[in-house]
Structures are given as structure tokens and as C-alpha cells.
Amino acid sequence: MDRRDRIGDNLMKPCETSTQGALVSINGSETEGTFPTLTTSRLSLREVLPSDAPSLFTVHGDAEGMRWFGTDPMTDIAEADKLVQVFADWRRSGSGVRWAVERLSDGLLLGTCGLFRWNRKWRSCVVGYELATFARGNGYMREALYAAIDYGFDVMQINRIEAQVHPQNAASIQVLETLGFVREGCQRQAGYWRDAYHDLLQFSLLRSDCVRRG
């Protein structure tokens, strides 16, 4: 049996005290040229497909729900089609992987998450994610990130995962801190969207953080 099929037994977990959202299985591997589908107790993290564009447009077109995401809200379905292509290009170029977060109970797309800006020499990357407004408050993104980060540390052999979050995005900050991310500082006016500059908080999670706390 491949060690990735025994994910619940031996592989390193993110720095979280609860086991909810533990990665159950991996099918495929980015390092082996096949898209890695991750499964948790409630979610399937799978490849983002062209057929997902309408759902992505619904998520990204929600101006209030996406106000801290870092881009202007979508106004045309063509923008969602382009985003699907961007995620596919990440994989082809080897710069990262983006998963569609799908609820197992009904196959509904809840959002996406991923690891990108993958610097293989430095063993670092950035984590990004977004969740539909209707799905928030249920721990879905924490569960999805738990699996994605586990994959990053074990399969991609990442040492440092970074995240940038708007200071007013309290829910996202809470998710990161629950997973063990450490706040490193504030990047002043590092982002620009909706005709305004925005400060961004810098977070990181190291492999050694999990070893010390694990």
C-alpha cells in the first residue's frame, strides 16, 4: 500500500489540536504529473474544471462576501472562465495547485483553496482560498486547508507556507491561527483593489512549527 493511502496514520498534520478535517486519502500527486484529489470527512478537494465556472462566478461575484479577497468582484462569466484557465496554468507550469472544494454530501462547490508561488529551491509557497458566503461558519475552509497544508508539507516537501490577509478579515485570521500560522507583521498598502490601497497581515507556518507542537 502506498504511504499516501495511509495518510491518517503517519503523515505530519498542521498545527491544530483537533483532528476534525483530517486528510483521509490522496489520489494522484502533483509531483507525479497527475492531479492530486484529496478527501476529508466532509469534502473532496479536486481539480477545478471548466464546468465549475458558473459556481466560481457566483462566489466571486458576491461583492460583499469577497470584499477582503484582494481583487474586484467579478461582473462577467468570462472572468470565471479565465480564472479556471489560470488555475490550470499553475499546474502546467509547476508553480502551484488549486483545488475546487466540493461538499461530499451533495457535490456542491463551496469555493477553492490552493498552494501557489511554489519556490522549489526555497521550499516555500503561498496559500490562498475563498469560500461562498452560504458555506461559512461550518469549518469547511479549515477542513480544506488542513488537508491542503498536510499535502504541501508531506508530498510537495514544503518548509514554509505564507499567507497574506486583510486586517479586517477576522474570520480568515481565525482560520489561519487555528491551523498554527504565526503573525509576522503588517505589509503597508501591499494590496490594491476597489480603487483603494490595503494593508495586509503576513502569516507563515513552518514545518518545524508542527514538529514542535505536534
Can you annotate each of these PLM segments?
Residues 89-95, 181:
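Short loop/turn motifs at secondary-structure junctions and domain boundaries
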Residues 64-86, 97-99:
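Conserved GNAT-fold acetyl-CoA-binding loop/helix
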Residues 86-87, 151:
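A generic secondary-structure signal
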Residues 2-67, 98, 102-214:
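Acyl-donor (CoA/ACP) binding surface of acyl/acetyltransferases
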